[in-house]
Curated annotation (Swiss-Prot):
Keywords, sorted A to Z: Acetylation, Cytoplasm, Isopeptide bond, Phosphoprotein, Ribonucleoprotein, Ribosomal protein, Ubl conjugation
GO biological process terms on file: translation
Origin species: Oryctolagus cuniculus (Rabbit)
Protein name stated in the entry: Large ribosomal subunit protein uL1
A GO molecular function held by the record: RNA binding
Covalent cross-link Glycyl lysine isopeptide (Lys-Gly) (interchain with G-Cter in SUMO2), where: 118, 161
Modification type Phosphotyrosine: residues: 11
Length: 217
């Protein structure tokens, strides 16, 4: 981490976000977001970056993943209670934009068997892709539960036209250490994507859904 982000600052901010929030118990599980503002970056000219990093603890426990599976995958999913759909169920949506949109809204991410993944644009049209939820490949030599966990704990940095971005790095029921570890991973990964690394970072904050932002950098 170097001297750039001090451990003390990080723990202090995390404590404030996690425990400052105990005064008010919310009805839902608040997410903790890392907010990044950039500098010396021209989104028009500079390459827009994107990248994914896997965190140690799942930032969003309620994150839902649906398997678009062949027979074997659907049977496996059924056995471990993972939401799944087979090719017949997808065909029934009949490329109806509204229904595909509804499906994309219902789940946070999708996994698909090899035999299905190539057919998805043909069966469903561009809906999942438009929603930024095109399925990741699920092969038969991967453990489905482990793969779903991996999807749940992976976050994506995507530079758009503006100079600030935000990603979920945890939630308020985490321990200080879990959250610090996740933030540390996320920040280091993000900085590695930037052209001039830390020289492109104007400020970093963490913030729970309803809480006040705490500055890290």
């Amino acid at each position: 981490m170097g001297d750039i982000l001090s451990r003390d600052t990080l723990y202090e901010a995390v404590r404030e976000v996690l425990h400052g929030n105990q005064r008010k118990r919310r009805k839902f599980l608040e997410t903790v977001e890392l907010q990044i503002s950039l500098k010396n970056y021209d989104p028009q000219k500079d390459k827009r970056f994107s990248g994914t990093v896997r965190l140690k603890s799942t930032p969003r426990p309620k994150f839902s993943v649906c398997v678009l599976g062949d027979q074997q995958h659907c049977d496996e999913a059924k056995a471990v209670d993972i939401p799944h759909m087979d090719i017949e169920a997808l065909k029934k949506l009949n490329k109806n934009k509204k229904l595909v949109k509804k499906l994309a809204k219902k789940y946070d991410a999708f996994l698909a068997s090899e035999s299905l993944i190539k057919q998805i644009p043909r069966i469903l049209g561009p809906g999942l892709n438009k929603a930024g939820k095109f399925p990741s490949l699920l092969t038969h030599n991967e453990n489905m539960v482990a793969k779903v966990d991996e999807v749940k704990s992976t976050i994506k940095f995507q530079m758009k036209k503006v100079l600030c971005l935000a990603v979920a790095v945890g939630h308020v029921k985490m321990t200080d250490d879990e959250l610090v570890y996740n933030i540390h991973l996320a920040v280091n990964f993000l900085v590695s994507l930037l052209k001039k690394n830390w020289q492109n970072v104007r400020a970093l904050y963490i913030k729970s859904t309803m809480g006040k932002p705490q500055r890290l950098y």
